[in-house]
Swiss-Prot record:
A family per Pfam: SHMT
Species this protein is from: Francisella tularensis subsp. tularensis (strain SCHU S4 / Schu 4)
Enzymatic reactions: (6R)-5,10-methylene-5,6,7,8-tetrahydrofolate + glycine + H2O = (6S)-5,6,7,8-tetrahydrofolate + L-serine
Gene name in the database record: glyA
Keywords: Amino-acid biosynthesis, Cytoplasm, One-carbon metabolism, Pyridoxal phosphate, Transferase
Cellular component aspect of the GO annotation: cytosol
Family to which this protein belongs: Belongs to the SHMT family.
Protein name: Serine hydroxymethyltransferase
């Protein structure tokens, strides 16, 4: 028999306990600017760390292949209903373990190996699962890639031209590092012109969409996929959404189970349900509005400091910075900022001459610092501190002085009180 006191993590595995404690310390002492990261609430983490992790539940609620699922059924049903309400759709599959799993299920549901897919190029801001040659999406399927125009917006003329030329079976509208707004209607018009399925990958902007501060892809898309963390502030996981298309919804059900997954992670699904409930609160709309304000505040300062922003600025939560003029690579800047207690990720920019392991850019975002309580004033300070370091990578004095300022700021805004 287990005892929660006797068999605590600290008593059972001191090495893992210490690693977690160090990560908790890092999260408190560093300003988190990685655009895909956020802080889950204590309620979300409590659900994810619950005894639901013990339960196997192959199948869907009400139709399981195991007994004893009556209570995990409650959790999954709540997660589905809340996701449907949040995004205004009549179908939601909450079982995908990740955004990539959700994307893979959609591929399996609507395509056959060798079918043509049109997605955003990784170097232009797309995701690996949008047809990158190193990913399943670029190996199993015939991947055609679109990019950005001279203004840093999606090149819709190119999308239309490529669609006409290659007749894709599916077009993906979505991104991993693009700071603009997607014109869902334009994509739908292009998709309809070649009889293609239009899929939206809203992993980065799902929270903004749910709050009504970023255009909703429905009714223009056939299906939307997303992660449940990032701007949604939930556990790490995936989600498939569909509306007014029961035939397609049925395909998505079987594409996840038994298609690419077995038992769902019921503790994660419960945590998703909690996150969706939190996102249905009016305060969540206020949060997303502040996310946008904070991103614009950083944009203003970074432009003043002479840092080039791809697409000329941001209309969402993230900024892709071209730091070529600093004389340092993205890899060097990421390391220097890390020493200064600012966490970012190096990122390729359009037509980047450097490899993806080095890069000429940085990707930053405002979701995590907004959750922390930062407003425009703090974000302007953070942007200035970032610029101080990026122009002086390797300068120990600048890095140490910045780290001290960051620690002072973080102490005023604890992540978990």
């Amino acid at each position: 028999m287990f005892s929660f006191e006797k068999n605590s993590l600290k008593n059972t595995d001191k090495e893992i306990f210490d690693a977690i404690e160090l990560e908790v310390k890092r999260q408190h002492e560093h300003v988190e600017l990685i655009a895909s990261e956020n802080y889950a609430s204590p309620a979300v983490m409590e659900a994810q760390g619950s005894q639901l992790t013990n339960k196997y539940a192959e199948g869907y609620h009400g139709k399981r292949y195991y007994g004893g699922c009556e209570f995990v059924d409650i959790a999954e049903k709540l997660a589905i209903e809340r996701a449907q309400q949040l995004f205004g759709v009549d179908y939601a599959n909450v079982q995908p373990h990740s955004g990539s799993q959700a994307n893979a299920a959609v591929y399996n549901a609507v395509l056959k190996p060798g079918d043509t897919v049109l997605g955003m190029d990784l170097g232009a801001g797309g995701h690996l699962t949008h047809g990158s040659k190193v990913n399943f999406s670029g190996k199993i399927y015939n991947s055609i890639q679109y990019g950005l125009d001279e203004n840093g917006d999606i090149d819709y003329k190119q999308v239309a031209q490529l669609a006409k030329e290659h007749k894709p079976k599916m077009i993906i509208a979505g991104f991993s590092a693009f700071s603009g707004i997607i014109n869902w209607q334009k994509f739908r018009e292009i998709a309809d012109s070649v009889d293609a399925v239009l899929m939206a990958d809203i992993a980065h902007v799902a929270g903004l969409v749910a709050a009504g501060v970023y255009p909703n892809p429905f009714p223009y898309v056939y299906v939307a996929t997303t992660t449940t963390h990032k701007t949604l502030r939930g556990p790490r996981g995936g989600l498939i959404l569909c509306n007014n298309n029961p035939e397609l919804a049925k395909k998505f059900q079987s594409a996840i189970f038994p298609g690419i997954q077995g038992g769902p992670l019921m503790h994660v699904i419960a945590a998703k349900a909690v996150a969706f409930k939190e996102a249905l609160e009016p305060s969540f709309v206020d949060y997303q509005k502040q996310v946008l304000k904070n991103a614009k505040a950083m944009e203003k300062v970074l432009k003043q400091r002479g840092i080039n922003i791809i697409s000329g600025g941001t209309s969402n939560h993230l900024l892709l910075l071209d730091i070529t003029n600093t004389g340092f690579s993205g890899k060097e800047a990421e390391a220097a900022l890390g020493r200064a207690n600012i966490t970012v990720n190096k990122n390729s920019i359009p037509n980047d001459p450097r490899s993806p392991f080095v890069t000429s850019g940085l990707r930053i975002g405002s979701p995590a610092i907004t959750t922390r309580g930062f407003k425009e004033k703090e974000c302007e300070l953070v942007a200035n501190l970032l610029a101080d370091v990026v122009f002086n990578c390797g300068d120990e004095k600048v890095e140490n002085e910045t780290a001290a300022k960051v620690l002072d700021l973080c102490d005023k805004f604890p992540v978990y009180k």
